[in-house]
Design a protein with these regions (language model features):
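A Zn2+-metalloprotease active-site environment signal
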Residues: 1-237
């Protein structure tokens, strides 16, 4: 799927999510937490170009939806949403929030959303052919078709889990991104341990697409030790 199509679908889907949250008076309701999440995210964004220079041209956005969900995402093109449940239920520290947001940013930097959407579109939904149809219809049909494409693209982004390979890649890049930004990489370990404790009753939404296990925690611990010198050289003094 062309990057321009993915970016357009992501932007439109993000706009729809913002409008829905705003309609329910759930968007950016806590100024302190909004300021906090933006401060953390902006430190990560400042170092994102190390992994993808084009990220400096992205129209980054950062918002918080008031929700009990323990979750966050970064759509293609840098559209970040953090659910307040992630902060409240886990009592997340700045370093732990950086671990989650850095992980989600890494999915966008490596275009994992595009890969997932493209695979599903080609194999099941024919979205590329559908896009060609959009470009050749009259304006009214085009508007209706575009709305369907936005819904479809957003559904694909949220519904399809990342592969284990994509998760490992986002773990590694996200942790390095956090360390380069001066956040403690060991916070990823404490975060996943908190997630696992939440998992004893009802699994957090984050775990439905980001499965946690002891192997993953061990891998994160090993990565954190390797990245400790990088963190030490970049942490705030």
């Amino acid at each position: 799927m062309p990057q321009s199509m993915v970016a357009s679908l992501a932007s439109d889907g993000y706009r729809a999510a913002l409008q829905e949250a705003s309609k329910k008076n759930k968007l950016n309701v806590d100024p302190f937490q909004v300021s906090r999440v933006k401060r953390i995210s902006n430190r990560l964004i400042a170092n994102a170009t190390y992994f993808k220079p084009e990220a400096s041209q992205w129209a980054w956005e950062i918002n918080i939806e008031d929700s009990n969900e323990v979750n966050a995402y970064c759509m293609p093109g840098g559209k970040i949403m953090v659910y307040s449940g992630l902060i409240r239920k886990l009592n997340a520290t700045d370093d732990e929030l950086a671990a989650v947001i850095g992980h989600e940013i890494s999915h966008a930097l490596r275009e994992h959303g595009r890969e997932r959407m493209s695979t599903a579109a080609v194999q099941q939904l024919g979205l590329i052919g559908f896009a060609a149809y959009i470009s050749n219809t009259n304006s009214r049909n085009r508007a209706n078709a575009t709305m369907q494409a936005v819904s479809l693209g957003t559904t694909l982004f949220f519904a399809l889990p990342n592969s284990r390979t994509q998760e490992r890649e986002a773990d590694a890049i996200g942790l390095e991104l956090a360390a380069r930004s001066g956040f403690n990489p060991f916070a990823s370990v404490t975060l996943w341990e908190k997630m696992k404790r939440q998992d004893t009753k009802k699994p957090p939404e984050f775990l439905s697409t980001h499965p946690s296990d002891d192997n993953r925690i061990r891998e994160l611990t090993d990565l954190a030790y390797k990245l400790k010198p990088l963190y030490e050289s970049n942490r705030p003094r």
